[in-house]
């Protein structure tokens, strides 16, 4: 409420009530992303999720339809210090109408995206929903599927449009993607296989399976790979040299999961 000069008599004042929403009071995830600077995104991330590093990428999107929600999802630039420990908890902060229900809702992200941080705010959820009920909640499952699709879509865009950034991402979290291809008997392999990369013997640079197949010379009918500690050592193996002598490239499998992930595909078109 503020006073303005009255028009009836000089010196008279009348009361007017002005309803204003201060932009600074609107949660970041509810703002239009065109109004938010990179610095604001980064500062919010570092403050909210106690990270000293700027995030590698930000996925800010709204969904309307079967599930209506606002969300900001961050891909860290480095693995959390406890990421590979039993103490690490995956999950996104879950809100309903700006009120937090849970600090880390594990049901919102699959294990292969366990590294992401973020916030989801939906008006479709009951404020009193319990942790046990969440697992069976239809809306939560719909939201989780939408988030999964969005992260996959944004990673594919990054791979296509910003190769350098994607390779940085894959250096840090590529093993998670490969485990995602292999786990649950390959249930998610079709959505993740084109996000996998491996170093090749030919130039010691990352290639996707699609790129490898597209560059196969005439006469090559198989994908060749070799396991070892590092591409430099794999290149010196007699078996590798026998294949490269034919003009065929060899993929370097340096993580334990690599062979399992590719075998889960059975074949690659």
Regions found by a protein language model. Name each.
Residues 1-269:
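Conserved GHKL (Bergerat-fold) ATPase module
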């Amino acid at each position: 409420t503020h006073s303005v000069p009255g028009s009836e008599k000089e010196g008279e004042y009348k009361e007017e009530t002005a309803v204003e929403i201060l932009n600074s009071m609107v949660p970041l995830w509810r703002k239009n992303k065109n109004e938010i600077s990179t610095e604001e995104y980064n500062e919010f991330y570092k403050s909210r999720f106690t990270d000293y590093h700027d995030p590698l990428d930000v996925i800010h999107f709204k969904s309307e339809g079967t599930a209506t929600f606002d969300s900001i999802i961050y891909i860290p630039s480095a693995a959390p210090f406890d990421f590979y420990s039993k103490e690490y908890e995956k999950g996104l902060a879950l809100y309903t109408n700006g009120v937090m229900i849970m600090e880390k809702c594990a049901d919102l992200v699959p294990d292969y995206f366990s590294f992401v941080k973020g916030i989801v705010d939906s008006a479709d959820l009951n404020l009193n929903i319990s942790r046990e009920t969440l697992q069976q909640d239809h809306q939560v499952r719909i939201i989780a599927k939408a988030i999964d699709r969005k992260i996959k879509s944004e990673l594919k865009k990054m791979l296509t449009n910003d190769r350098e950034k994607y390779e940085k991402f894959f250096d840090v979290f590529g093993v998670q993607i490969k485990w995602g291809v292999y786990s649950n008997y390959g249930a998610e392999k079709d959505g993740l296989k084109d996000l996998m990369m491996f170093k090749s013997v030919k130039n010691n640079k990352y290639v996707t399976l699609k790129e490898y197949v597209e560059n196969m010379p005439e006469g090559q009918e198989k994908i060749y790979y070799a396991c070892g500690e590092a591409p430099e050592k794999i290149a010196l193996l007699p078996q590798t040299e026998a294949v490269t002598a034919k003009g065929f490239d060899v993929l370097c499998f340096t993580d334990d999961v690599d062979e399992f992930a590719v075998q889960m595909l059975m074949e690659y078109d």
